[in-house]
Amino acid sequence: HPALRGTVVDREDAAPGAQALLATRGLGRRVRFAVGDFFTWVPGGADWYLLKSILHNWDDAAAARILARCAAAAPEGGGLLVIERLRPERLRAGSRDDAVARADLNMLMGLGGRERSLLEYERLLSAAGFRLVSCEPLGHEFAAIKATRMNDADQVRSRETA
């Protein structure tokens, strides 16, 4: 997709490595690097926002703040793609769910975050002003969760029914 353009937002200390990698991959003209903190700023004007293995690092309150920043930056109908490991609603012992349970415990102990179920992501997304559109499995318990920013009237209705 040579017409696509993007912005990577990360800490200042990540800039040299990210810019070098983008240049070696031939993406220097298509992808720019912006120093930022997603708790305080997300660049506006994008058609899509991508969060890959971000939200599971944080508790629900912090994840909600990140999603709220994305919603504030996105236009009505703008897209959000969240790529995360999904925890089943109910874990089954002795199954592949054991790996998700271990990852969940690791996130809690290491960063204070957690793995979440699709229903938990849907609630976080809705509270931030996004509507869940789809969820596609990617393998190894990961999924691509696609959402769009609701218009103001839909956000009011969503809060009223919550």
Language-model-detected regions and their locations in the chain:
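Alpha-helical subdomain
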Residues: H1-A162
